Amino acid sequence: MQINELIKYMESLGLDIHTTTKARGHQGFFLDGRIDISNSLPEERLIPTLLHEFAHYIHSKIEKNINKTGGSLKIIFDTEKNLTSELFAVTNFVDYHSKCEKLIRHREMVKDSIKKLDLQIKEEFPNFQRSKKFKEFDRAIRGTKLKYLLKYDRVRIMPWFMFGKEEVLSINTIEKDFPNLKIAFVNYIRLKSLSRKQRRISNRISKLHRYYNRPTELFARLVEGLYLDKELTCKLAPNATKRFFELLEKGYYGELKFIFDNYVTIC
């Protein structure tokens, strides 16, 4: 399939296609009759991405406000069956980032580091519990500026007076800045920092899972998967692909039928 041929057909439907933009930092996006494909995409990603965004266009004609609502599988597949797990398997094939493997590994490394620090603190304070106040630590830092490092990894403390000196505190220089501070307390500050990092990573994973599980994204990646590898996609999602082709033949997906009739062989 030639990309120019596909663009020409889509433009004949009234779509505004752009392939020389940054696509808002994404591979592509669809909004209000316009499709943008990133100018930094490698050639082999152009057609799959264009089909992905065209699938959003088709979905938007069937179901309104998908950009806000994320759509509904019941509507786009016109069924009460739960097809989510099949569709997500296709998503994992189409976009390896959807597995969040790198983030999950990073989170596990952070969790291991937290456990090690926890054990080191307990060597000196056996009753230490992360979920409870560390009273010995609170007493030790009373009247110091170390409290800021319980919330931030690096802080700039501005002077009260115009000619005072700015002070910078960092978890990387605790031993140097506070040479008399017990190692257990240094470890506690670093443990709190790692706990914040763990939460950030978990939030990132949750955000990605919400994005990849949006019905409109699951549908678009099914279309993308059928172009990339029809046989594998049908194997990963037998019920979803069967329903997709039933509706495609009935004209439920409108102009998407022309794309499949001319460029994608039904499996």
Residues of each region from the PLM?
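Short, exposed beta-strand/loop patches in secreted or surface proteins that constitute
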Residues: G25-F30
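Post-HEXXH active-site segment of zinc metalloproteases
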Residues: E44, S60-R105, A237-T241
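Pan-zinc metallopeptidase signature
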Residues: E101-C267
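Short pre-active-site segment immediately N-terminal to the catalytic Zn-binding motif
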Residues: L31-L51
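Zn2+-dependent metallopeptidase catalytic core
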Residues: M1-G14
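Active-site recognition of the HExxH zinc-binding catalytic motif
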Residues: P48-K61, A220
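Generic structural signal for residues in well-ordered beta-strands
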Residues: L15-T20
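Hydrophobic (often cysteine-bearing) scaffold residues that line and stabilize catalytic clefts
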Residues: Q2, I47, Y212, T216
